[in-house]
Amino acid sequence: MVERLPPEVEAKYTKYLKLRETLSVVMREKATVEAGLAEVESVLKELEGLPEDAELYRLTGFVLVKKSKNEVVEDLNKRKEDLELKLKVLKSQEEHLKKELERIESELRRLLQGGAVGGAKGA
């Protein structure tokens, strides 16, 4: 006969699994933002070498729109700023989730090693 886990242990394990999935999503999103940031920085570096009156075009939907170098650089710097802010938030979320996962993992170990009897509550 298979013994069921105590409700407290089941609840903590369920929370642990949900947090792991959330962490996975945050890490994927962070990787996407980092790639976008690297691309923006690469384009900005390429634009540095162009003359101020260079003809540049920006894809808007399915249409190429002529823009000045200054407008493109301004747009890219704004995008870079937005991505850096988003990256900062994602790193903070990642750190928080990792700490929370470690805490719950430690509680689960303690509950399982102690037979889940008299375990502390407060997750």
Swiss-Prot record:
One GO process term, biological-process aspect: protein folding
Q: Which InterPro entries match?
A: PFD_beta-like, PfdB, Prefoldin
What superkingdom heads the lineage? Archaea
Task: Give the range the annotation lists for the signal sequence.
Answer: none
Keyword Cell inner membrane in annotation: no
A Pfam family that this protein carries is Prefoldin_2
Q: Which UniProt keywords apply?
A: Chaperone, Cytoplasm
What Gene Ontology terms describe where this protein resides (cellular component)? cytoplasm; prefoldin complex
Q: Which GO terms describe its molecular function?
A: protein-folding chaperone binding; unfolded protein binding
Localization in the cell: Cytoplasm
* Function text: Molecular chaperone capable of stabilizing a range of proteins. Seems to fulfill an ATP-independent, HSP70-like function in archaeal de novo protein folding.
Query: What family does the database annotate?
Result: Belongs to the prefoldin subunit beta family.
Summarize the subunit comment: Heterohexamer of two alpha and four beta subunits.
Protein's name in the database: Prefoldin subunit beta
What is the source species?
Aeropyrum pernix (strain ATCC 700893 / DSM 11879 / JCM 9820 / NBRC 100138 / K1)
Q: What is the organism lineage in this UniProt record? A: Archaea, Thermoproteota, Thermoprotei, Desulfurococcales, Desulfurococcaceae
